[in-house]
């Protein structure tokens, strides 16, 4: 585990910010497999900056994020710590080893958050193109509803399948393609993840754990640019997005 010194007391604008949004810790889930990339996706450079560094920089610059806890594989801890130093990620307080499953990793991160945290924002380390606006809107809604996450509408026709054949259509107006950060009250998501583990569930996102408890998650507007970099094609698309942003 790598531990960083906490930054100096928040300036006035930070104290003013906390009057309208609660203390929020971002947990960056920076583990997982990179088999589809042939190399570690987190350290692939997009326009000269590693994917994980770009992700951290967005949360570092957000005025609604107070702390960053990074959960990663043991062999990546030192490398990520070096990147935090290189890119001045001063909000990063801890880098911890993740678990065998995503739920275990998120729980490991929750165990390290500040006692002041009233919200926890769980974000995929491989989503470097999330924007400050998405983070802020989702934090504010989670502060009111206890759970919130960004989504985008499903555009393709979706079918159920059985034995290799179509078995009926699914109304895409009732579907949402979920993104991160997914933001919750710490006690809510911790209880939900522990219950999901006890129930033997295998989940691909954290909202599913909360839904398993019978609770609802408020949906905020995501972005088609908030992609998860998992394939070589994603790298090309991400670089195109960065180029377009630089030309605006």
Residue ranges and their predicted role:
Residues 2-5, 176-248:
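Conserved alpha/beta core of the MobA/IspD/sugar-nucleotide pyrophosphorylase nucleotidyltransferase superfamily
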Residues 28, 52, 109, 123-124, ...:
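Residue-level signal for inorganic ion chemistry
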Residues 45, 129, 169, 183, ...:
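Short aromatic/basic micro-patch
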Residues 78-83:
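Acidic helix N-cap motif at the loop->helix transition within catalytic regions
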Residues 88-100:
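Conserved donor nucleotide-binding strand/loop of the catalytic core
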């Amino acid at each position: 585990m790598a531990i960083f010194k906490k930054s100096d007391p928040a300036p006035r604008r930070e104290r003013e910010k906390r009057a309208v949004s609660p203390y929020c810790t971002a947990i960056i889930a920076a583990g997982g497999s990179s088999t589809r990339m042939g190399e570690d996706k987190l350290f692939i450079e997009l326009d000269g900056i590693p994917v994980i560094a770009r992700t951290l920089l967005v949360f570092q610059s957000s005025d609604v994020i107070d702390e960053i806890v990074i959960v990663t594989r043991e062999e990546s801890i030192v490398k990520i710590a070096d990147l935090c130093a290189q890119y001045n990620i001063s909000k990063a307080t801890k880098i911890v080893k993740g678990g065998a499953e995503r739920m275990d990793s998120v729980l490991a991160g929750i165990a390290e958050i500040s006692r002041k945290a009233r919200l926890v924002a769980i974000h995929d380390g491989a989503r470097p193109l999330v924007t400050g606006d998405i983070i802020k809107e989702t934090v504010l809604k989670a502060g009111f509803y206890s759970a919130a996450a960004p989504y985008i509408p499903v555009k393709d026709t979706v079918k159920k399948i059985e034995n290799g054949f179509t078995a009926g259509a699914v109304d895409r107006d009732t579907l949402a393609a979920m993104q991160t950060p997914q933001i919750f009250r710490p006690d809510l998501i911790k209880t939900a993840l522990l219950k999901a583990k006890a129930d033997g569930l295998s989940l691909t996102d954290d909202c599913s754990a909360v839904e398993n408890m019978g609770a609802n998650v408020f949906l905020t507007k995501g972005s088609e640019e908030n992609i998860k970099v998992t394939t070589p094609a994603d790298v090309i698309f991400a670089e195109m997005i960065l180029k377009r942003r630089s030309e605006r």
